Structure formats: structure tokens, C-alpha cells
């Protein structure tokens, strides 16, 4: 297989990813700032489909209207020159100190109103640039201590904010949807809507739930010790996987943002298998940080590695599914039975069926092996390149 990406693969990158300068809580930047235009051109050369941005990635915070127009003009020209797309945009409501207690759920009402206006302004730009999805990551929406935040009131304010944003895009006739990005902690000690499940439950309370989905990130769910492919499966099941952030993470620790495939490789395999078999048609968006040890050659090598690893795993997953032994092993593990309704004949038929309880042989059923180990080893063989 050719592992050279093309725009048809729909790989996208945030400007903040390749543009990360390597600054962390313990050390200063190790790389200069990247011009967004340079990022667009270099990613296009690597075979990417598009780029995404926070408002402050593209337009420095505090820019005048004329400066803003010039930044947007240069960026738009780079998009036109390269054919790169902007499928998604988002708002930075976490860097400036004004957001130290959050944006939509800050205790200070004036900060909340400012956060909404900042978001609305960037939604206008996102739509102008062709974005179909608007991501909301509430990195500062949370607390470090129990008395600092009444979570019920905070969720009311969160709901109010999203309802207002939904009202705005509807009134403007914008064809754009929102994707909530969960994260359990960091930078706040505890963040509201910490997992995919929390976000899905929250969405059902909104006035226009059809406008809202989720943008799960590999590392964020794995920071909480959760199974990322399972979370994605539930989002797909709910019809709410509006966007996805791909990266690498090694277990429960800080948010590593490794290149995709460089963390939990087995989870990455099952994730790609799921996305491809489910027919997910959205962008494969990489939200990672090239390590601060790297110069710009390393930055572009890391970005290329994200795409290459996805394509390799896509090939391995396809070979796994096409393998006759795997298909037989799936039947031996009774995956086909799981797909059958338990009581398609209805409740009364279930109650009348003596074989379902009175005559059910629990000992025989308990003695049946599931053959999961053989199935899993076949998956490992394909992942490691020993088959197909």
C-alpha cells in the first residue's frame, strides 16, 4: 500500500499543533513562532486536506480591526493557493488571564458575556472560511476546590451559553454544528463535562440538541483510564461524532499529545478499525504537539508520521477484516449473535418461552468458551505485520 497521504484522506491539523513552540510549565520555548501561512503551505506539501484554528492562532489577541483583516487576507490567500480547507474552527477561552476562572462558566458575569461575544465573532469568520464544525473545549471551565464553583449553576450557565450560540447560528442561517470536546483535568484540577458520556448527557438538555455533538480526543479519554474506541463507538451509536482529535497517550498521566500511533498502539488499531468500518466521513484531525526536543525538521516529520501511522493502521485493519480466519473467529466468538435482537418477538413471547428461563441450561451455557483469545491474537498478528 502507498502510505503517502493525499487530500482525499481528509487529514487535518490545528495551527496550534505544528505551531507549538515547546513552551511548558517547566521550560521556555525551544522553537520560534510559525507564521500560519507557512504552516498551511508546509502541511499542504505533506498531503494534508486542511487546517483548523483558534481565533488567537490566526489573529493575535488584541489586534485592531485593520490588523485582523490583514491576517485573514493572508491566510485566505494561502488557502486559495494550496487548495487547503478549513473544516473546523474554535475559540481560545483559556490563554488570556481574563479566563482564569473559565469563559462560559466564570463566576464573573461580565467575563461570561465577553466569552460569548468573542466566540460569536469567530463563528462568523469560521463560516466565511467554510467551516462546518465549531469545537468548544472548556479547558478553564472547572475548579480546584469544592467551594469555588456551584456545579449546578455552572452547568446552567454552560447550557445558557450553548443555547445562545445555537440561537445565533440558526438566526444567521449558518450551516455549522458544534462539537463539545471533553477532558477530565488540566489545566483546571477538575473540568466540567470531563468525558464523552458526560458531554452526551449534557447535550440532551440543550434547546437544539441536533446542533451539538462531541469532539473526543484520544489522550483526554485515556487520561481518565477509559477505553477510547468504546467512547467513539458510543458517540457513533448516538449519532453525535461530529469531529475527532487524534493523538497518542501512554496511560493515566498529563496530556502528552504525542503524534498519532506513538502512544497506545492497540487502542489506535481498534480506533482506526472502528472509524473505517463505521464509514465515518469527517476529517481525521490531528491534535498533537511535536516534542520540544525537535527543530522544524522534526516538527514536519512528526506531522507526516501522524498521517503515515493512520494509513498503516487503516491497511492493517482492512487486512484483519478481510482475513477468512478472522471471519471464522468472529463467528466462533458469536459476534453475529450479538447483532441479533434479544427479544424481537416481544415481551410476551419472552415470558412464554420456557427455554429462556425454566428450561435454560445454565451449566451448559457457562461451559461454553468464547474464543476471544484466538480472535485477539489474530488481531495482534495483523497489527504486528505477521499476517496479510
Swiss-Prot record:
Its main location: cytoplasm. It is an enzyme of class 5 (isomerase). InterPro entries: Xyl_isomerase-like_sf, Xyl_isomerase-like_TIM-brl, XylA_actinobac, Xylose_isomerase. It holds the Pfam family AP_endonuc_2. Binds 2 magnesium ions per subunit. It catalyses: alpha-D-xylose = alpha-D-xylulofuranose. GO terms for molecular function: identical protein binding; magnesium ion binding; xylose isomerase activity. Its EC number is 5.3.1.5. GO terms for cellular component: cytoplasm. Mg(2+) 1 binds at residues 181, 217, 245, 287. It is found in: Cytoplasm. Mg(2+) 2 binds at residues 217, 220, 255, 257. Signal peptide: none annotated. Keywords: Carbohydrate metabolism, Cytoplasm, Isomerase, Magnesium, Metal-binding, Xylose metabolism. The active site is at residues 54, 57. Its cofactor is Mg(2+). The keyword Lipoprotein does not apply. One of its GO terms (biological process) is D-xylose metabolic process. Homotetramer. Belongs to the xylose isomerase family. Involved in D-xylose catabolism. PANTHER family: PTHR48408, XYLOSE ISOMERASE (PTHR48408:SF1). This is Xylose isomerase. It comes from Streptomyces rubiginosus. The gene is xylA.
Amino acid at each position: 500500500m502507498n502510505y503517502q497521504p493525499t487530500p482525499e484522506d481528509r487529514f487535518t491539523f490545528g495551527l496550534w499543533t505544528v505551531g507549538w513552540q515547546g513552551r511548558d510549565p517547566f521550560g521556555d520555548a525551544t522553537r520560534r513562532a510559525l507564521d500560519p501561512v507557512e504552516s498551511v503551505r508546509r502541511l499542504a506539501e505533506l498531503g494534508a486536506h486542511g487546517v483548523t484554528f483558534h481565533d488567537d492562532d490566526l489573529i493575535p489577541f488584541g489586534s485592531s480591526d485593520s490588523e485582523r483583516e490583514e491576517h485573514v487576507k493572508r491566510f485566505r490567500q494561502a488557502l486559495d493557493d494550496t487548495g487547503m480547507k478549513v473544516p473546523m474552527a474554535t475559540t481560545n477561552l483559556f490563554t488570556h488571564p481574563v479566563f482564569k476562572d473559565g469563559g462560559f462558566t466564570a463566576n464573573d458575569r461580565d467575563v461570561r458575556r465577553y466569552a460569548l461575544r468573542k466566540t460569536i465573532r469567530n463563528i462568523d469568520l469560521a463560516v466565511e472560511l467554510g467551516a462546518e464544525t465549531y469545537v468548544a473545549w472548556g479547558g478553564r471551565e472547572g475548579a480546584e476546590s469544592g467551594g469555588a464553583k456551584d456545579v449546578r449553576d455552572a452547568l446552567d450557565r454552560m447550557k445558557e451559553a450553548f443555547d445562545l450560540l445555537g440561537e445565533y447560528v440558526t438566526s444567521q442561517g449558518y450551516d455549522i454544528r458544534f462539537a463539545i470536546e471533553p477532558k477530565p483535568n488540566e489545566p483546571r484540577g477538575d473540568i466540567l463535562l470531563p468525558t464523552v458520556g458526560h458531554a452526551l448527557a449534557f447535550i440532551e438538555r440543550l434547546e437544539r440538541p441536533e446542533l451539538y455533538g462531541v469532539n473526543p480526543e484520544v489522550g483526554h479519554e485515556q487520561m481518565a483510564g477509559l477505553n477510547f474506541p468504546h467512547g467513539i463507538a458510543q458517540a457513533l451509536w448516538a449519532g453525535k461524532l461530529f469531529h475527532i482529535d487524534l493523538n497518542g497517550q501512554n496511560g493515566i498521566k498529563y496530556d502528552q499529545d504525542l503524534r498519532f500511533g506513538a502512544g497506545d498502539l492497540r487502542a489506535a488499531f481498534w480506533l482506526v478499525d472502528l472509524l473505517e468500518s463505521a464509514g465515518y466521513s469527517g476529517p481525521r484531525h490531528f491534535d498533537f504537539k511535536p516534542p520540544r526536543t525537535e527543530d522544524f525538521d522534526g516538527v514536519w516529520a512528526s506531522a507526516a508520521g501522524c498521517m503515515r501511522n493512520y494509513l498503516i493502521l487503516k491497511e492493517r485493519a482492512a487486512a484483519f477484516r478481510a482475513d477468512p480466519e478472522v471471519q471464522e473467529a468472529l463467528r466462533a466468538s458469536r459476534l453475529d449473535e450479538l447483532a441479533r435482537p434479544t427479544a424481537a418477538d416481544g415481551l410476551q413471547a419472552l415470558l412464554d418461552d420456557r427455554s429462556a428461563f425454566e428450561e435454560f441450561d445454565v451449566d451448559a451455557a457457562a461451559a461454553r468458551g468464547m474464543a476471544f483469545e484466538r480472535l485477539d491474537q489474530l488481531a495482534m498478528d495483523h497489527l504486528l505485520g505477521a499476517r496479510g
